Amino acid sequence: MFVVLVYDTAAERNPNALRTCRKYLHWVQRSVFEGELSAAQYRALMTTLRDQLDLTYDSIRVYRTRSPALVETEWLGVPLGNQDSVL
């Protein structure tokens, strides 16, 4: 599956969320990651994040699709993160 993950966490938890997401996905912009994951990788990522974050304060939003070809992406402004083609 192709995943776009966005997180908003307290500053003290940002480094952990960043490190965890980078193990599984490409960093594309500040708190935004994308990439292809198997079902097992997705479950492992979400379990790890769930254990690291305060779910009464932090939030994660995940968009999933079968293929990156189904996602249309448009960039404006200064590119951040890893600009290698994921799509």
UniProtKB/Swiss-Prot annotation:
Domain of life the protein comes from: Bacteria
Species the sequence originates in: Frankia alni (strain DSM 45986 / CECT 9034 / ACN14a)
* Residues bound to Mg(2+): D8
**Keyword Nuclease part of the UniProt annotation:** yes
Its assembly, as annotated, is:
Homodimer, forms a heterotetramer with a Cas1 homodimer.
Q: What does this protein do?
A: CRISPR (clustered regularly interspaced short palindromic repeat), is an adaptive immune system that provides protection against mobile genetic elements (viruses, transposable elements and conjugative plasmids). CRISPR clusters contain sequences complementary to antecedent mobile elements and target invading nucleic acids. CRISPR clusters are transcribed and processed into CRISPR RNA (crRNA). Functions as a ssRNA-specific endoribonuclease. Involved in the integration of spacer DNA into the CRISPR cassette.
Indicate the family of this protein.
Belongs to the CRISPR-associated endoribonuclease Cas2 protein family.
A family per Pfam? CRISPR_Cas2
Alphabetical list of PANTHER family matching this protein: CRISPR-ASSOCIATED ENDORIBONUCLEASE CAS2
What the entry lists under InterPro entries is as follows:
CRISPR_associated_Cas2, Virulence_VapD/CRISPR_Cas2
So what EC number does this one have?
A: 3.1.-.-
**What is the protein name stated in its UniProt record?**
CRISPR-associated endoribonuclease Cas2
Per UniProt, which keywords does this protein have?
A: Antiviral defense, Endonuclease, Hydrolase, Magnesium, Metal-binding, Nuclease
Q: Which SUPFAM superfamilies match?
A: TTP0101/SSO1404-like (SSF143430)
Q: Which NCBIfam families match?
A: cas2 (TIGR01573)
Among the GO molecular function terms of this UniProt record, one is:
RNA endonuclease activity
Transmembrane helix in keyword set:
no
What HAMAP family does UniProt report for this protein, alphabetically? Cas2
Q: Which GO terms describe its biological process?
A: defense response to virus; maintenance of CRISPR repeat elements
- Cofactor(s) listed in the protein's UniProt record: Mg(2+)
What gene does this protein come from? cas2
